[in-house]
Amino acid sequence: MAAHGQYHKCMVGMDIARCVEEILESRKALERIEGKPVTGFAYAFGAYDEVVLKALEASGISYARTIEATHRFDIPQKFLIWNPTCHHDDDKIFELADEFLSDGFYFSLVTPAKLFYVWGHSYEFDQCDNWGHMERFLGRVAGHEDVWYATNGEIREYVEACRRLIYSADGRTVYNPSAIPVYLGGTFTKEYIEVLPGKTEKLLKPINM
C-alpha cells in the first residue's frame, strides 16, 4: 500500500509545506485503514522535483514510484526515484517477461539481481477491456521457483538490508546488522549462503575459471 497524495495533486511547483500536507494527510488516511505505518508513495501524474523529494523525506516516505518505463530490470539506486520496468499495457511486456525469466546473461553495473516492476491502475482493465491481457501476463510469470514475488516495501527492505552488510577487510566474512536474513550467492555459481540477523558468516570462495 502506498500514499498517492490527499487530492492527487501535481506537487511540482508547490512549496514544501503544502507538499508535506498533501503527503501526510494521504498517509494518515491509509494508516487508519491499514493499522500500520505506510511509507510508500506513488507520484500523482508521475511528477516530482527537488522540493517534492525533500517533502517525501520529511514526511517519512522511504520509497516512491515514478511512471518512467525503463524496459530494464535494475534495482533503483535511490528508492525515492523508483522507475518501473513498464506499464501493464506496454507493447513489450511479454518480450520483457521472456527476457526476465530467461537464464541468459543480464549485464548491469548497478544491480546484482534482476527486478521486473510492472505498474498500472486496476480501473484501466475495465476501461480498456483488457483483463485477458493481464491474465496472460500473470500466467506467464507465475509459479517460478526461482522468482521472488514481493511488494515494493519488501523489496526496499531487503535491498537496504543488503546495502547495510559489513564485510571484513580481507573479503572473507560478512556481518548482517539488519533484522532480516540476507542471501548471498557466489560468482558464476548457483550456491549461496544465508546470513541471519546479527550473525557473521564466511563468504563463498571464488570458483576456478
Range-by-range predicted roles:
Residues 1-52, 57-62, 68-86, 113-122:
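Metal-dependent polysaccharide deacetylase catalytic core of the NodB/CE4 family, i.e.
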Residues 13, 50, 91, 127-128:
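Loop/helix-junction capping segments adjacent to catalytic residues or to phosphate/diphosphate-binding pockets
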Residues 94-109:
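A short, acidic, amphipathic alpha-helical segment used as a generic capping/interface helix at domain edges
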Residues 207-209:
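Generic C-terminus detector
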